[in-house]
């Protein structure tokens, strides 16, 4: 695979080309969706500020150090270590760390921001147990429990449901189940926080969800063992990846292998599909280079917005 580097001008031109592809390949569905541009005016909610602070400080560390303090808690590993997310003092990135799965990471972000020691006081273990049904013996709800709670957000204090990808704002949480036969062990699904809506990106893979869908790309914050993107997936994958990167993928210029995947908390990009007619969630794709997309019927999706007060 080549090490062709895209200039900012080239990258913007490539993005413009992608927009043209979207408009040409999916004119009817894009027109029906009335896709708005990204809105820079939404203020980041407090929990997004806290999540990004943690990720950004960890990113300032060398890769070798990040690998020791920013880790995904893979099932069966780290039996003697509890899930944790630690925020340090300003200017001390070495004091920040993560050892978590997707749901425990975002639960700890909410607990830090709105928990008993905050000005808000509601995001406690008791709250998550009552409204997101934390399983006996567990400290955090699973992604599956979050998805169920978001789907019933009208009955969940401090959350309101978001049923359409086009309405997602920075800080909103989106959870989806994995296949029904695999929703108990070891992983039930995945949950992410929206960082920014990036626009749409059409692909032949979209047809796996349906012929009348709109593929919205979102930059997200999450904790995962599988970064969102594979720059080595195909001859064209590197250029696309550079437009929609993941902070957990390390590049080795001029070396073999050229890329190393890391895990833990970071930023990536995911595709959420909307039905062009109803605007409701229709499915998702893990990243813009993924060759597989999943329908919402196959893997249910629900999203919610946090209201601090």
Stretches found by the model and what they are:
Residues 35-133, 274, 279-309:
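N-terminal capping segments
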Residues 4, 98, 184:
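Residue-level marker of regulatory loop/turn positions in helix-turn-helix DNA-binding domains and
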Residues 1-18:
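N-terminal secretory signal peptides and thylakoid transit peptides that target proteins
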Residues 222-309:
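Low-complexity, Gly/Ser/Thr/Pro-rich intrinsically disordered linker/tail segments
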């Amino acid at each position: 695979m080549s090490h062709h580097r895209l200039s900012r001008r080239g990258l913007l031109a490539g993005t413009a080309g992608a927009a043209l592809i979207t408009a040409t390949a999916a004119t009817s569905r894009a027109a029906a969706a009335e896709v708005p541009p990204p809105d820079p005016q939404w203020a980041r909610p407090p929990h997004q500020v806290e999540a990004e602070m943690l990720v950004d400080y960890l990113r300032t560390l060398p890769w070798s150090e990040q690998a020791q303090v920013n880790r995904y808690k893979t099932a069966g590993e780290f039996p003697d270590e509890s899930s944790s997310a630690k925020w340090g003092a300003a200017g001390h990135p070495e004091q920040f760390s993560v050892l978590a799965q997707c749901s425990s990471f975002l639960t700890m972000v909410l607990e830090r921001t709105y928990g008993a020691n905050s000005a808000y006081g509601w995001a406690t273990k008791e709250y998550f147990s009552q409204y997101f049904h934390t399983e006996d013996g567990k400290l955090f709800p699973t992604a599956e429990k979050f998805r169920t709670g978001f789907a019933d957000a009208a009955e969940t204090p401090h959350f309101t449901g978001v049923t359409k990808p086009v309405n997602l704002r920075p800080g909103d949480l989106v959870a989806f189940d994995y296949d029904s036969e695999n929703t108990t062990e070891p992983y039930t699904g995945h949950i992410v926080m929206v960082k920014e809506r990036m626009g749409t990106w059409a692909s032949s893979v979209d047809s796996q969800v349906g012929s009348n869908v709109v593929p919205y790309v979102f930059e997200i914050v999450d904790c995962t063992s599988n970064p969102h993107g594979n720059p080595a997936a195909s001859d064209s994958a590197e250029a696309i990846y550079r437009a929609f990167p993941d902070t957990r993928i390390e590049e080795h210029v001029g070396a073999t292998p050229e890329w190393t995947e890391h895990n833990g908390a970071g930023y990536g990009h995911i595709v959420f599909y909307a039905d062009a007619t109803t605007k409701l969630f229709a499915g998702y794709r893990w990243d813009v280079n993924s060759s597989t997309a999943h329908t919402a019927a196959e893997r249910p999706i629900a999203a919610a917005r946090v209201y601090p007060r």
